[in-house]
């Protein structure tokens, strides 16, 4: 399957007169008057569905003439169940936007798309094509990043951890050292797959060494955090939280979900780009980590919806004070901006990967607003997007 995955991902698109699947089925002729650059038919190579991220990636066979190809219009069922019709435009800022497009959905069969073409007299579109007619390969993030070199793990259980707590910990992350290392590696793989396209982008060994500690927390109420000591990076997991499992105060199911989500957030800090952005842009650091957590399925729907509906007013002068001014709600850290950034994948399934590129590219000039316009286009206004995000959350809350 890995060979098939690599071949599916290393494809492009050529300019064309119709949309067809691998079997040659024609979905729609281009409108009269559109002259394709190569005279060939526009053909979808196939599709890859990442079940961890709910991402359907449809790749074209050969790269099109950028003078003719403008992008695709896509109709699909969004993660919240809403029916959406959006445009994913070819963007010169990202050459890959001419090779494929990505849709975030739990129901790939609902995805329909039509090509948008440039013409002297105006814009033309093809007829609708259905992803349901494509060959879809289902993958996990571990398939995409199967060839990373895992970190060297140092596993530590502190002496003050009781046997009962250690046993509960084993039930969540694995009984043997090898099982624990595999668990942490899978967390790292899903984080990497949410913000990087490939190991080439992320690096062969993005994290070379990490100490994973089960012990008491320095910060009351925290479940886990990532820091460092003289040996290098470390991740500390709360034995107090795990103790609630051993006493029955927290179910094993809830603890397993929560610990996975927290570790996704913390491992994000090991591999995310921060560049010259600095801590005065909390949405870039803590917001991004929660965006990754949400994208990777580490947040309950109830918490995600509540985070949107209780985010506060769109603009508040009182939030201008302090070292990290956040007058706009989408500037705020953690889930307030993070769940919104994850929702922006509605408009481009590669949004978080492209945002990683903007963080490196823009450095100290980065802002979420600039990143959105760089990725989606200047016609996308933050307040309009935020309002739609809140309306989607309200529709889910009613449902």
Residue ranges of model-derived segments:
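C-terminal motif of bacterial Sec signal peptides marking the signal peptidase cleavage site
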Residues: 15-18
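Zinc-dependent metallopeptidase catalytic helix centered on the HExxH motif
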Residues: 224-307
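Pro/Thr/Ser/Gly-rich low-complexity, intrinsically disordered linker/stalk tracts
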Residues: 23-67, 124-142
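Pan-zinc metallopeptidase signature
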Residues: 331-399
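Solvent-exposed loop/turn segments flanking beta-strands in beta-repeat/beta-sandwich domains
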Residues: 63-83
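Solvent-exposed serine/threonine-rich low-complexity stretches and specific carbohydrate-binding patches
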Residues: 84-94
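Beta-strand-rich modules
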Residues: 102-123
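Auxiliary, metal-adjacent structural segments of Zn-dependent hydrolase domains
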Residues: 174-240
């Amino acid at each position: 399957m890995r060979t098939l995955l690599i071949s599916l991902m290393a494809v492009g698109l050529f300019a064309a007169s119709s949309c067809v699947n691998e079997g040659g089925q024609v979905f729609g002729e281009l409108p009269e008057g559109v002259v394709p650059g190569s005279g060939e038919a526009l053909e979808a190579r196939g599709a890859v569905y990442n079940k961890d991220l709910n991402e359907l990636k449809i790749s074209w066979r050969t790269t099109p003439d950028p003078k003719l190809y403008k992008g695709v219009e896509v109709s699909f069922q969004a993660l919240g169940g809403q029916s959406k019709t959006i445009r994913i435009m070819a963007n010169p800022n990202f050459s890959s936007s001419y090779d494929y497009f990505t849709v975030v959905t739990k129901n790939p069969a609902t995805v329909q798309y039509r090509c948008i073409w440039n013409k002297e007299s105006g814009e033309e579109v093809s007829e609708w094509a259905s992803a349901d007619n494509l060959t879809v390969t289902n993958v996990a993030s571990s398939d995409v990043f199967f060839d990373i070199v895992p970190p060297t793990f140092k596993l530590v259980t502190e002496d003050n951890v009781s046997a009962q707590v250690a046993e509960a910990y084993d039930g969540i992350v694995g009984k043997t050292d090898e099982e624990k290392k595999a668990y942490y590696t899978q967390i790292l793989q899903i984080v990497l797959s949410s913000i990087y396209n490939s190991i080439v982008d992320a690096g062969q060994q993005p994290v070379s060494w990490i100490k994973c500690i089960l012990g008491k927390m320095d910060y009351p109420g925290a479940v886990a955090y990532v820091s460092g000591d003289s040996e290098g990076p470390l991740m500390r997991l709360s034995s107090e939280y795990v103790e609630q499992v051993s006493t029955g105060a927290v179910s094993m199911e809830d603890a397993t979900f929560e610990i996975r989500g927290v570790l996704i957030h913390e491992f994000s800090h090991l591999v995310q780009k921060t560049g010259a952005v600095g801590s005065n842009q909390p949405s870039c650091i803590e917001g991004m980590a929660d965006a990754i957590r949400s994208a990777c399925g580490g947040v309950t729907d109830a918490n995600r919806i509540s985070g949107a509906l209780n985010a506060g007013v769109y603009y508040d002068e009182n939030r201008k004070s302090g070292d990290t001014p956040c007058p706009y709600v989408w500037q705020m850290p953690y889930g307030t901006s993070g769940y919104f950034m994850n929702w922006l994948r509605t408009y481009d399934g590669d949004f978080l990967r492209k945002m990683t590129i903007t963080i490196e590219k823009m450095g100290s000039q980065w802002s979420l607003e600039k990143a959105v316009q760089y990725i989606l286009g200047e016609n996308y206004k933050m307040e309009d997007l935020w309002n739609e995000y809140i309306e989607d959350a309200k529709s889910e809350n009613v449902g």
